[in-house]
């Protein structure tokens, strides 16, 4: 088996003039992987390349694939992902993965940007202040999840109510309100963070529903899962597929009520 022409062209656009040493050390493996990832998978559906790479970066963050993430930053930019969009993906990951897992990715992103001649810091994307982040976060939750989120931040048992407060003012008020990505794109990268890290099926199902409410329908989410199988493998992909199917059923049941 040889590397297909489609795979070769796609790889060249990702990494111009780069010659992988795997062709010398692991020729059988790299032929199968490249033909699968960069021909069979990318040509399976009509997802645009920019969206594909946004999901790949978010998935690699969730999966903690630091070396592959670093390699994919220039590739993503070659397919239309802007530096500010890459930074927004990294920033939002903190709310879902924690700074302990995101810190190395932020450092690697800055290194790649420096190598690419991208001046830091990038233009500010913040739209909230300390004074209005709570109310802005609540409005964002309502916009994404529906009117049932009104007053969410002050509900629940007293001993844990502060966590809901933080979810509203920090996760949504600090991150989701930023410019650089749309609500639909922010829900999409959250879906990728959760699908890739695994073990958070209730949250993944909830955010699959939020994606569907914001224009990322069931088939689109299945396409996202499919496009990222080369990066996270089959077990977590199949778990994510189950969550998407469950979310679609729950959405249909709600529509029938």
Feature-to-residue mapping (PLM):
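Acidic, glycine/proline-rich low-complexity segments that act as flexible tails and inter-domain linkers
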Residues: 1-50, 70, 102-183, 205, ...
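Hydrophobic/aromatic-rich structural module bridging two neighboring secondary-structure elements via a short loop
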Residues: 72-106
